[in-house]
Amino acid sequence: MDQGQVDFAAVFDDLAARDARETTVPLGGVDVRLVRVPGGGEGRWDSHDDSTETVVVWSGEFTVEFRDRTLLLTKGQCCVVPVGAEHRGTSPTGAEVVLFRKTPG
């Protein structure tokens, strides 16, 4: 069920209290994924053939690696992962990240 609004701080507090890593919340037809990335965490290579993904750092530092470049994002910064781009995320010190993904059409 689409909630219409999301309190990111409250969701991250809830994840921490439950020692959970992530949750997905539907919002206006967009899947909003909130992820707590542990220090030293390194994601697997991934790509999305049907959607872009916007990555927003809520806290900490998060690196988005592409095959041809690397972006270091800090609190309040974001980037867009284009359709089909291979990428993965890493964080040497830990981060809280919000991912927005909508399939076109």
Where do the protein language model's features map onto the residues?
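A generic "binding-loop/recognition-motif" signal
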Residues: G41, D50, R69, A85, ...
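Ligand-binding loop in jelly-roll beta-barrel domains
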Residues: V83-G105
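Short, conserved beta-strand element in jelly-roll/cupin
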Residues: S47-V64
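A short, N-terminal "cap"/entry segment at the start of jelly-roll beta-barrel domains
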Residues: M1-G39, R44-W45
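A cytosolic small-molecule/anion-sensing beta-strand core signal
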Residues: W58-S59, T74-K75, T93
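Short acidic-glycine-tyrosine-enriched beta hairpin
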Residues: D68-V83
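Short strand-coil-strand connectors
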Residues: G28, E65-R69
